[in-house]
Amino acid sequence: MPYIVDVYAREVLDSRGNPTVEVEVYTETGAFGRALVPSGASTGEYEAVELRDGDKDRYLGKGVLTAVNNVNEIIAPELLGFDVTEQNAIDQLLIELDGTENKGKLGANAILGVSMACARAAADFLQIPLYQYLGGFNSKTLPVPMMNIVNGGEHADNNVDIQEFMIMPVGAPNFREALRMGAQIFHSLKSVLSAKGLNTAVGDEGGFAPNLGSNEEALQTIVEAIEKAGFKPGEEVKLAMDAASSEFYNKEDGKYHLSGEGVVKTSAEMVDWYEELVSKYPIISIEDGLDENDWEGHKLLTERLGKKVQLVGDDLFVTNTKKLSEGIKNGVGNSILIKVNQIGTLTETFDAIEMAKRAGYTAVISHRSGETEDSTIADIAVATNAGQIKTGAPSRTDRVAKYNQLLRIEDQLAETAQYHGINSFYNLNK
């Protein structure tokens, strides 16, 4: 039997040069799993806790030796002898060992590393791909990539308020072609920006981070790049935005301060603005359009745009079934962003995806801005037939690692692989 004989964590670096947790799980059969934990820059206040050491003399306080020690000294002894294929039981033990609502004792970064490494070891023992282990034989849907090609907000050092402007190749016949389309548009955008004398350095997620005259100029420039690449905006390629509005929401006056444009808006004015942008550009998805605590604003946005635009809750729902349940009950949003480190275990992650699907919400599997070479989220996207993945631009190895894994999975699935394109938006009246 694949009993766990050793669990070992170490401190490694993520794509921003900050420490993160890597966990290895060994079994008596020789099966092995390794996982690396991502980290966010714009984080929701209700996310599970990521433990940092706080020692300013070491990695500017961002070390994770406390989380590493929690794995090696507290979690590891408790897991010895466990059957590594008992994912639910392992995750439940991790939750109980922590004993807090927000994983604040052991750290979500410690717990998630163990949860993912166990799943990889189990797949290794069974000699099957990770997506098949996690999802079963019916795991066959390749996701539409949501590719962040213009970065702003907390992800870039520029004057753009909206955090992410993305393209979605909904008209592609398969994932391989979707990735090709995205890559060609990415390179087309670089030439468009260069021709305008704009910066073509990239941000945390691989997208370009130029200073622009307005947030709307980002949309105009992307549409120009799509056309220059030979594709049709609105037909073959849709646009998506992640406003990450909590980052420019002012709690004191309850308004949204778009400092890049020198504009201050109320919730209702933000909704009006989004409605105007949707009428002018082929936008199919808006994430965190309002602050995570502005539920009235989110409800208004859903009433106005929820039938024709995917409204994704990230900071709003934080991959948490309690928060998602509240949103479903109150008619807020129609989609959830899934980030494994927001909740801390694979079991809880899959629970959130299931709840979303039962309610007719879509689930978008997502990376974090601080990433690694770990490609687990690519397998999760296929395992759950989620239909959408958000993992940055086709640039930087930490992003491309996920896309390359999806190419491998599509090859493995061969003729059984499916790519639903525009039909991935089953929550909209198309």
From Swiss-Prot:
Catalytic site: 205 (proton donor), 339 (proton acceptor)
Region (Sufficient for secretion): 1-140
Modification Phosphotyrosine occurs at: 281
Cofactor note: Binds a second Mg(2+) ion via substrate during catalysis.
Any single Pfam family the record assigns to this protein: Enolase_C
Annotated GO biological process: glycolytic process; sporulation resulting in formation of a cellular spore
Record PROSITE patterns: ENOLASE (PS00164)
Residues binding (2R)-2-phosphoglycerate: 163, 339, 368-369, 390
Modified residues (Phosphothreonine): 141
PANTHER family reported in the protein's UniProt record: ENOLASE (PTHR11902:SF1)
HAMAP family: Enolase
Protein's UniProt name: Enolase
Organism: Bacillus subtilis (strain 168)
